[in-house]
């Protein structure tokens, strides 16, 4: 598999395709738009959400204010399909293991356009409070996917654009350096791909109890999911 070099892969593309996949699992389609890749430090352009025939049409989108321009730099590399596939498989495994807990979380998030960003920031801050590892990065993607699905279920489709932007910003600003220092997404594929070691070869913490803390306004940590770099 080709390596991305010093710039890494396009985090925006990884986020957009992951969200598209999670929404498609529930019968929704998402057009992420035609904006170019956002390099680390820059925010992406939001996309447009639509539903399949028979679904309630998405309300019109209000775009967030444009972010400050980022300094010019090398463009990130296109993302190999195997990266998307491995991340999807890891997220699906995570979701299956905690299916009931995620269902309860979805029903209790009480997302609104006014609370969504605070919910996102609180969970993500606590998720990475004790450091970064690949498991927590997968949990980050899966939590973002849950927020997007719940937003559409509650007829707040424009929030999907914002969640995608927040995820990309966080990856670019806070996780990109760790990812590159630990071999990039290529290392994730090599460590956790189909022919490599199982994803779940360690003890898991109780996600249900930790999510319950978040839902009453306390901090949340998703624990040592994967538990390794």
UniProtKB/Swiss-Prot annotation:
Short sequence motif named BH1, residue ranges: 126-145
UniProt short sequence motif BH3, positions renumbered to this chain: 83-97
A GO cellular component annotation in the UniProt record: nuclear membrane
Family: Belongs to the Bcl-2 family.
Name under which the protein is recorded: Apoptosis regulator Bcl-2
Modified residues (Phosphothreonine): 62
Keywords, comma-separated and alphabetical: Apoptosis, Autophagy, Cytoplasm, Endoplasmic reticulum, Membrane, Mitochondrion, Mitochondrion outer membrane, Nucleus, Phosphoprotein, Transmembrane, Transmembrane helix, Ubl conjugation
Pfam families linked to this entry: Bcl-2, BH4
A GO term, aspect molecular function: channel activity
Alphabetical list of CDD domains matching this protein: Bcl-2_like
Localization (cell): Mitochondrion outer membrane; Nucleus membrane; Endoplasmic reticulum membrane; Cytoplasm
Gene name in the database record: BCL2
């Amino acid at each position: 598999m080709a390596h991305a070099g010093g710039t890494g892969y396009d985090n925006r593309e990884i986020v957009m395709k992951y969200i598209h996949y999670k929404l498609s699992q529930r019968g929704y389609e998402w057009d992420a738009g035609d904006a170019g890749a956002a390099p680390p430090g820059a925010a992406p352009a939001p996309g447009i959400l639509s539903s399949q025939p028979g679904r309630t049409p998405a309300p019109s989108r209000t775009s967030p204010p444009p972010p400050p321009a980022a300094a010019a730099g090398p463009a990130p590399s296109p993302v190999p399909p195997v990266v998307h596939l491995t991340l999807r498989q890891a997220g699906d495994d995570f979701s299956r293991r905690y299916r009931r807990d995620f269902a309860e979380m979805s029903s209790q998030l009480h997302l609104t356009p006014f609370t969504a960003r605070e919910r996102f920031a609180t969970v993500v801050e606590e998720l990475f409070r004790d450091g970064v590892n690949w498991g927590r990065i997968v949990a980050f993607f899966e939590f973002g996917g849950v927020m997007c699905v719940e937003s559409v279920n509650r007829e707040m489709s424009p929030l999907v654009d914002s969640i995608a932007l927040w995820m990309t910003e966080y990856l670019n600003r806070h996780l990109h350096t760790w990812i590159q220092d630990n071999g990039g997404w290529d290392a994730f594929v090599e460590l956790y791909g189909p022919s490599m070691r199982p994803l779940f070869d360690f003890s898991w913490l109780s996600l249900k109890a930790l999510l319950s803390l978040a839902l009453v306004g306390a901090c949340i940590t998703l624990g040592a999911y994967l538990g390794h770099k």
